[in-house]
A protein has these predicted regions:
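Short hydrophobic beta-strand segments
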Residues: 86-95, 167
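A short, structured active-site edge motif that brings together acidic residues
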Residues: 118-123
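Extended, H/D-rich, highly charged conserved domains that either
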Residues: 94-108, 112-114
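Short, contiguous, pocket-lining structural segments
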Residues: 36, 40, 68, 72, ...
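A short, well-structured juxtamembrane/interface segment
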Residues: 68-87, 99-102
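Extreme N-terminal basic, low-complexity initiation segments
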Residues: 2-7
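Surface-exposed, charge/polar-rich loops and edge strands
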Residues: 9, 13-64, 82, 110-113, ...
Length: 278
């Protein structure tokens, strides 16, 4: 996307991340779904968080209850940077978490347009638009959550450009492309929203950067029908190519809690008549 095209994006100007996080409902653990499946996922999260903490590879502020930052995140980002998927991508959509900060930084350094989710999708304009041609901070500072409030503007999903590569954070992954987030369902929601807006399609690749201790054996991670799968898993040491088979795209209103819908303005706006939970 060139500078002229980027200038056309509508937005509300600079955001206030501190205010967003302070006022956002704490709904990180209410993705909804089958209780047995949720319990199995929760058990795996605890196991991987123990690995990260016990192995001394979790960075501040620690492993638990988050997409954990890890020693080697920069090396993993650099390895992703060397992939064909990266070279072919002009526009990225990324999660806002710390372990993918080096990925966002390198994307801006390489002249890529980056859309970063506002924490918890808690604003009516739920994505930051980080344009490498219009930054007020250097790429490293601009690509942090705090820096995005100075260097980016928030945009509506209908004002975003088509995405070439999706970057998501994970607590755990396996070589088949199965992934496990922190339990809020945000990555799946972002994917479904972007699909319905026509920003991504069947050929859009999904990648993550993780530490080796987060890579589990095949078929260890239970998956729900709405869970997205990965095409690329990148660690500091290797690239794992996955099948990336996709679930049926779109929002599954029956699996969203009332708290989740109420806390995310875009979901409240999109909610169709008759989509009330029983």
């Amino acid at each position: 996307v060139g500078a002229a095209g980027r200038a056309g994006f509508a937005g509300s100007g600079q955001g206030n991340v501190t205010g967003m996080v302070r006022t956002a409902a704490r709904h990180d653990r209410d993705a909804g779904g089958d209780p047995t499946l949720l319990a199995a996922k929760a058990s795996l999260r605890e196991m991987v968080w123990d690995r990260l903490a016990g192995g001394g590879v979790a960075r501040f502020p620690g492993a638990r209850n988050r997409i954990s930052n890890f020693v080697g995140a920069e090396a993993a980002a650099e390895r992703l940077r060397g992939t064909r998927a990266w070279r072919r991508a002009g526009t990225l959509k990324s999660n806002p978490d710390s372990p993918q900060w080096p990925v966002r930084q390198r994307a801006l350094e390489d002249g890529k347009l980056v859309f970063m989710a506002v924490p918890r999708l808690a604003e009516p304009e739920p994505f930051f638009c980080l344009d490498p041609d219009r930054l007020t901070d250097p790429p490293r500072a601009a690509s942090s959550i705090k820096g995005a409030s100075r260097s980016a503007r928030t945009v509506r999903i209908e004002d975003m450009a088509p995405v070439d590569l999706v970057v998501t954070g994970c607590v755990a992954v396996d070589p088949t492309g199965a992934r496990l987030g922190k339990g809020g369902g945000f990555s799946d929601l972002e994917y479904a929203l972007a699909w319905e807006a026509g920003l991504i399609g069947p050929e859009t690749l999904v990648a993550t950067t993780v530490h080796e201790v987060q890579v589990l054996e095949e078929d260890r991670i239970p998956m729900a029908g709405h869970d997205i799968r990965l095409d690329l898993i990148v660690t500091p040491d290797r690239v794992i190519n996955c099948d990336g088979s996709r679930p049926a795209p779109g929002l599954r209103w029956e699996e969203l809690t009332e708290e989740k819908i109420a806390a995310i303005p875009l979901l409240s706006a999109l909610r169709p008549a008759g989509a009330d939970r029983p």
